[in-house]
């Protein structure tokens, strides 16, 4: 059940207890465990009962005027508080504003002004978190919040990010937002979630970019966790467009390269031949030969691949595997 923020009486002290905010879920998204709960601090607002007397048209006009960028920069603390209250008191209205390009920019300008204003916006963001972080323009509000919010609010945001990480990473706009904040203080926890979902993400049009980003950070612990999650699936991934991108990155460092090549050598000869002629796999088999030939510490890997591929040399010459055939020719 979503909770509405109440407007406190004039000079009412800040209370540390605050109703928990539960998030609605978009259609077609199943969440196996309950969303994280957030207990933001309420803000000491002056009496805004006059808002109830405004017609919808008057309220809309006030909001349009208030959202002017130049006016935002001139607002005092009380007017900022009024502005934030108008924008955040209705979750759906806030979402509508945040999804608008200009609305998103203006909300971002309001963030980081005062802690009380930030408390209102943090609560509003968390009520519609998944909708906001996966939107083209609204996602920038989350990114800005993760830059200017205090530790308590950032922690609440990160709990939601961790909870929805798999959904966010597979969204066109969400994965870009995730990439922007992936190096923050909670990155190890986020990396653990990503590694756990590595197989699903590797096969996804957008999720594979998140896996690539984590791998390229060269965080040994996270890379090992991803390799463990993907072990036994490298051949299957190599046949797929998005999965092949991930395998390509894994072939670039010695430790992960060894695991991938060993798995290639374990597959049946016919399977390796099909991979070598595959639209995506041929490039990876060729790269595996090149990196193992260059890294002669494990000569057994290079010669193992050569011996498995040689029987198919003629088939490879007249297919997508012609570059592989050229390598085999060069070592005769």
Curated annotation (Swiss-Prot):
Superkingdom as given in the UniProt entry: Eukaryota
Single GO cellular component term: cytoplasm
Alphabetized InterPro entries for the sequence: ARM-like, ARM-type_fold, PUM-HD, Pumilio_RNA-bd_rpt
One Gene Ontology MF term: mRNA binding
PUM-HD domain mapped to chain residues: 1-332
Pumilio repeat ranges, renumbered to this chain: 89-124, 125-159, 160-191, 192-228, 229-266, 267-303
Subcellular location: Cytoplasm
Role of this protein: Sequence-specific RNA-binding protein that regulates translation and mRNA stability by binding the 3'-UTR of target mRNAs.
Domain comment (free text): The pumilio repeats mediate the association with RNA by packing together to form a right-handed superhelix that approximates a half donut. The number as well as the specific sequence of the repeats determine the specificity for target mRNAs.
Stored PANTHER family: PUMILIO HOMOLOG 18-RELATED (PTHR12537:SF166), RNA BINDING PROTEIN PUMILIO-RELATED (PTHR12537)
Name of the molecule in the record: Putative pumilio homolog 20
Taxonomic source organism: Arabidopsis thaliana
Lineage of the species this protein comes from: Eukaryota, Viridiplantae, Streptophyta, Embryophyta, Tracheophyta
Gene behind this protein: APUM20
